[in-house]
From Swiss-Prot:
Keywords: Aminoacyl-tRNA synthetase, ATP-binding, Cytoplasm, Ligase, Nucleotide-binding, Protein biosynthesis. It is found in: Cytoplasm. Homodimer. This is Proline--tRNA ligase. It comes from Herpetosiphon aurantiacus (strain ATCC 23779 / DSM 785 / 114-95). Its EC number is 6.1.1.15.
Length: 566
């Protein structure tokens, strides 16, 4: 492609709204432009990267026997009503009526469509298992869009779906798809980890997220440096300390005026926050008031709490609700209370005496011991994991990392197929629900993550596997000699099967070299008057900065050798 006739342009400075380095480079390099909030247009250079990522995906999915298919992006609302997700998705779902007043929606995901397709297409166990995939558009009316391609309203995903007769079959294909996804990320040059995750509205078993390491990531990851344990902080657990069997004096009351926070209490009593018990109150539709107790230096993890309580949603309790169970806000504890659901974190069990509220304004209790002085309805891991906590697998100190979600896989089971009546006849002629799996990778997100992990102060440093072009050919000067040599090289390299970005613009050497560094092709070939006098050109590797001089008649061979070594 000749830059003189290409669509799009580079920018010297990034627009002010671009805060992340990768977002800035996407705009400066002319890969994409924002047309509306949450809607980005990919320009030709960005589209070439997009297609190369797609090609890797097609190859790896074909290698595990997946068949490509395609569903509509507009779904009937009635389909989603049957699974309960029409109401569950809330305002993130874009809903509308057609001219016949049929309720429709722009698909935020495609599980319902696949289950309905299976209902219509699959009759017998002989048609299973089956693995399908598509690379297709989705729309989610996100409350906030951010970070360029990271959180869009309209975006593209690789979605794969498995259909099996039983859970054993699902387990097998789940592992195959997981390996294919990992190969895709590796081929794209992404540093990532697979982590345990929350299933959210998708449901199912063993949800796993693929997280790309990034200091600007919006997700917090808990990773063990010694073993394979890794989890999203939303669901991460920690190893439990050995129980403290020391004899603790009897519980006693102490005056603590104006100590309504853990920090104020710890300062007043000259103890650490870890020696206190924190009371946090939530309300749920299913179980009413939930009294949560964690160690004073810990924070409640609402996702883990919802799971422990067996409720779908939580909201902060009101002062009236707290008072109704006999607790006093700011001085609360479960001591002496009954007829209330109490959920305690492991951090307040088996740790000796703690300071807790006395349920009386201005007073706390010392030497409060779980099991002796109070009981919980449920004891569970409901606090956030912190740096240095023990790994639940090997006991090593856990570390916290930042990451960007680039993929996820779920064992959906029969949630969608049962709701939509997608069954098959087993060998005995009995109808059984089809067992589903769902697997996804966000393409725009993956594109930006590649840039996030592969750039320097000058610009993008593309991995060869996904670079828009194999080579950036730079013509210095506009003399007939230079133009003829550059054009001949462009033709020879293209005929040799190399993709070439040819900078034939009437610009200075400085502008061209800066743009070459910004655009980040793996190789830069420079043709100029000085070199041609000696029948040589300059070849520079973007990643290493290594420069070599090559004879004109050896250019194609030399570049092919470099590509082979890479």
């Amino acid at each position: 492609m000749r830059m003189s006739s290409g669509f799009g342009r580079t920018l010297r400075e990034a627009p002010s709204e671009a805060e992340l380095a990768a977002h800035q480079l996407i705009l400066r390099a002319g890969l994409a432009r924002q047309l509306l909030a949450g809607g980005m247009a990919l320009l030709p250079l960005g589209m070439r990267v997009f297609r190369r990522i797609e090609a890797i995906m097609h190859a790896e999915l074909a290698a595990i026997g997946a068949g490509e298919f395609r569903t509509p992006v507009v779904h009937a609302a009635s389909l989603w009503e049957q699974t309960g997700r029409y109401a569950q998705y809330g305002e993130a779902m874009l809903r509308f009526n057609n001219r016949n007043q049929q309720a429709l929606l722009f698909a935020p995901t495609h599980e319902e469509a696949v289950a309905e397709l299976a209902r219509r297409e699959v009759d017998s166990y002989r048609q299973l298992p089956s693995l399908l995939y598509q690379i297709h558009t989705k729309y989610r009316d996100e409350l906030r869009v951010r970070g360029g391609l990271l959180r869009l309203r309209e975006f593209t995903m690789l979605d794969a779906y498995s259909l099996d007769t039983d859970w054993a079959g699902l387990d097998m294909v789940y592992d195959r798809v997981a390996l294919a996804f990992e190969t895709i990320f590796e081929r794209c040059g992404v540093r990532f980890t697979a982590v345990e995750a929350d299933g959210g509205e998708m449901g199912g078993r063993e949800p796993r997220e693929y997280m790309a390491f990034s200091s600007s990531g919006e997700d917090s990851l808990v990773v063990c440096p010694l073993c394979s344990y890794a989890a999203n902080s939303e669901v991460a657990v920690r190893g439990q300390a050995a129980a403290n069997d020391d004899v603790v004096p009897a519980m006693s009351e102490i005056a603590t005026p104006a100590c309504t926070t853990i920090a104020e209490l710890a300062t007043f009593l000259q103890v650490s926050e870890a020696q206190t018990a924190k009371a946090v109150f939530f309300n749920s539709a299913e179980k009413g008031l939930i009294f949560v107790v964690v160690r004073g230096d810990r924070e409640v993890n609402e996702i883990k709490l919802r799971a422990a309580a067996g409720v779908s949603a939580l909201e902060p309790a009101t002062l009236e609700q707290i008072s109704a169970v006999g607790a006093v806000a700011g001085y609360a504890s479960p001591v002496g209370l009954s007829n209330v659901t109490v959920i305690a974190d492991h951090s307040v069990v088996g740790v000796g005496g703690l300071v807790a509220g006395a349920n009386r304004t201005g007073y706390h209790l010392q030497n409060v011991v779980y099991g002796r002085d109070w009981q919980a309805t449920v004891v569970a891991d409901i606090a956030n994991v912190e740096e240095g906590d023990a790994c639940p697998v090997c006991g090593a100190a856990l570390s916290l990392e930042r990451g960007i979600e680039i993929g996820h896989i779920f064992k959906l089971g029969t949630r969608y197929t049962e709701a939509l009546g997608a069954t098959y006849l087993d060998p005995q002629g009995q109808a059984q629900p089809i067992v589903m799996g769902s697997y996804g990778i966000g393409l725009e997100r993956l594109l930006q993550v590649i840039i996030e992990q592969h750039h320097d102060e000058k610009g993008i440093v593309w991995p060869a596997s996904v670079a828009p072009f194999d080579l950036h050919l730079v013509q210095l000067g506009a003399s007939a000699t230079v133009s003829e040599a550059a054009n001949q090289l462009y033709q020879q390299l293209s005929e040799a099967g190399l993709s070439v970005l040819y900078d034939d613009r009437n610009e200075s050497a400085g502008v061209k070299f800066n743009d070459a560094d910004l655009l980040g092709m793996p190789l830069r070939l420079t043709v100029g008057e000085r070199g041609l006098k000696q029948n040589v050109v300059e070849l520079r590797q973007r990643a290493t900065g290594v420069v070599e001089t090559i004879a004109l008649d050896q250019v194609v061979k030399s570049i092919k050798n470099i590509e082979h070594r890479a």
